[in-house]
Swiss-Prot record:
A Pfam family: GCV_H
Residue(s) carrying N6-lipoyllysine: 97
The UniProt record lists the keyword Ligase: no
Record lineage: Eukaryota, Viridiplantae, Streptophyta, Embryophyta, Tracheophyta
HAMAP family membership: GcvH
InterPro entries, per database record: 2-oxoA_DH_lipoyl-BS, Biotin_lipoyl, GCV_H, GCV_H/Fam206, GCV_H_sub, Single_hybrid_motif
Gene (name only): GDCSH
Protein's name in the database: Glycine cleavage system H protein, mitochondrial
This protein's GO CC annotations: glycine cleavage complex; mitochondrion
The organism of origin for this protein: Oryza sativa subsp. japonica
Any GO BP: glycine decarboxylation via glycine cleavage system
Length: 164
């Protein structure tokens, strides 16, 4: 009985329904490991996401990446005005498991840094796509965005990577 109640609560929280009712598809997809992949973003194979707002692109690490890292305890980011290059490291994330470089999915100039992360690096774990964003960049080569993965391709990439 307790298991059934838990399953029902989990299904409600995840908005999963087994009934024949149809509803609009959510704005995200969930891989088999329950990492959230948002529609409307582009992704790199090294697990960074980009939200392009025209003249400025917001960058962070994906839910999949933070899940593999574990609890984030420290973040090192560049200062505003720094230049970043596609595929080049712009900072690092230290977790209870490891320290990992953060690679820029696009080239450009850093116009804003999420200063909240220096005091509360755990925002990367609790809200990787909202409060846990890392830097905002003015892209120097907007066409680089076209080479990034869409949500479906990124989800497939994660599933293939986790299978090995």
């Amino acid at each position: 009985m307790a298991l059934r109640l838990w399953a029902s609560s989990a299904a409600n929280a995840l908005k999963i329904s087994c009934s024949g009712a149809t509803r609009a598809a959510p704005a995200y997809s969930i891989s088999r490991y329950f990492s959230t992949v948002l529609d409307g973003l582009k992704y790199s194979s090294s697990h960074e996401w980009v939200k392009n707002d025209g003249s400025v692109a917001t960058i962070g690490i994906t839910d999949h990446a933070q899940g593999h890292l574990g609890e984030v305890v420290f973040v090192e980011l560049p200062e505003a005005g720094a230049k970043v290059s596609q595929g080049g490291a712009f900072g690092n994330v230290e977790s209870v498991k490891a320290t990992s470089d953060i690679n820029s999915p696009i080239s450009g100039e850093v116009v804003e840094v999420n200063d909240k992360l220096s005091e509360t690096p755990g925002l990367i774990n609790s809200s990787p796509y909202e409060d846990g964003w890392m830097i905002k960049v003015k892209p120097s080569s907007p066409s680089e965005l076209d080479a990034l993965l869409d949500p479906a391709k990124y989800t497939k990439h994660c599933e293939e990577e986790d299978a090995h």
